[in-house]
Amino acid sequence: MASEQNSPDALLSIRSSCNRCRNHKLKCVVTEAPNGTACCQRCIRAMVPCKFGRRERKKRGSSPRVVPQSPWMHSPWETTSTSMQSIYPNTEAMDVGRADALVVHGTNAFPPPANVPAEQSLTGDHSAILTPGSMNMGIFNHLSLDANNLEADDIHAYKFPHGQLHEAHHTQYWHFQADEWRMDHPNDDSHSDYSATSSSKAATAALLQLAADLQERLDALENEPSWRRKNASMDKYPIGSVLQLSSKLQQLGRCLQTDDSSSTQSESSRSRASVGATSSVHRLQMPVLESGTSDACLNVSHLTSTTRFDTSVSLMLLSCFVTLLQISTGVLGHFQDYLHAHPKTRARTLSMSAAQSSIVSLGDLDPQQQTHDRIHTAIYVLLNSLEEVEEALCLPPRVRLAITLQASPRSDGSTSEQEKAMSAAFYGGLSAATEGIDDILTEFGRRVNDTKGMLRQHMDL
């Protein structure tokens, strides 16, 4: 017993979380096992042994005085004391020391905001510097990140300052303005590069989330039964969810665009930082389909426009666009199922009294086929949204499918050169990786034309 008390491990307390929950960073809920020992509920469900380790001894010794190394602790009047109960230093600073801590080599290292008086920069409350759980620095309250006082929305706004998540159709989407991702700092190239990199990473993360949402929506369309089996009417068909996904892709396409000036400025700053190093970001422009070409021959010359995309971003945008086309094709398939299940009905005529009345106007006539009119409107709304996505992705006008289907609709099911050359117009060197894109585009065009033809037959047009 004496040897056990004298051992160094005897003074170390047992952890309140088991080793398995600590490794996975999960909350450990401890319950008493039938044999009287404590066991974690997660370990009980996983049927694995539950072990509670002891806290580790500090590997570095504590010192009553610490030599300051940061600009906040360079003043000789500041002292830092360390206690065994807390790992955070307790900083006690005099007013002179606080004033010196804000001045580095005769200049104010952290200038106050424009709306704060200059004399307030030395009289603010700086006693909370380097205190546990807070970074309240008086005039620098706009930089404080006190997690105990912040709500969930505030923490999310700090992590994603330019975007907000909204719950719609059991999926989270991004809402932001396109100009918020572009930050111009002509006087500071390094700060401009940092801001552009941060906004690009956030937009790329939102693009990955959108790709997952599109795939989830496509799987739901392919696996669920036809809409006519659920409802006899198409009035409550959720067409807005598809339009919202299209709107998100359009916004991300505009946010991720770069131009030659920003690219040149970014590359020049990189060359100054590392002499002789080449840019690691490869830019790619969409090729143009020349007029008068046959068999969808393409010219891979660059566009006259300065809009460009990163190679990795352009591939993700292409994947999202193709998935959106597949979703639109599935929606048109639901419309066709409804038209097949409800055969053509003869239009009703007016009553004798209404037909002989001279005061009956066109607005007094009741619509005979409201559902068919709404389906027809939904088709053009889908095509308009796809046209806006094509513009946001900077597709050449000669290879845009949506505007072609609206301008010259065909009912014979033929395939145009635009549909055949779509994938090659995106990336001429990736034909092996984009073999199925032509089939998806052709199927979408055929489905649009077939649905329009069925509507014309049902509506006697």
From Swiss-Prot:
Residue ranges annotated as compositionally biased, kind Low complexity, are 256-274
Recall the GO molecular function terms of this protein's record.
DNA binding; DNA-binding transcription factor activity, RNA polymerase II-specific; zinc ion binding
Question: Which compartment or compartments is the protein found in?
Answer: Nucleus
> Quick one: where is this thing mainly located?
nucleus
Swiss-Prot/TrEMBL keywords: DNA-binding, Metal-binding, Nucleus, Transcription, Transcription regulation, Zinc
Question: Where in the chain is the DNA-binding region found?
Answer: 18-50
Which InterPro entries does UniProt cross-reference here?
A: Zn2-C6_fun-type_DNA-bd_sf, Zn2Cys6_DnaBD
Question: Which residue ranges traverse the bilayer?
Answer: none
Q: Does the keyword Repressor apply?
A: no
Q: Residues annotated as region Disordered?
A: 55-79, 256-278
GO CC annotations? nucleus
What is this protein's function? Transcription factor that regulates the expression of the gene cluster that mediates the biosynthesis of the trans-fused decalin-containing tetramic acid phomasetin.
Name of this protein: Transcription factor phm6
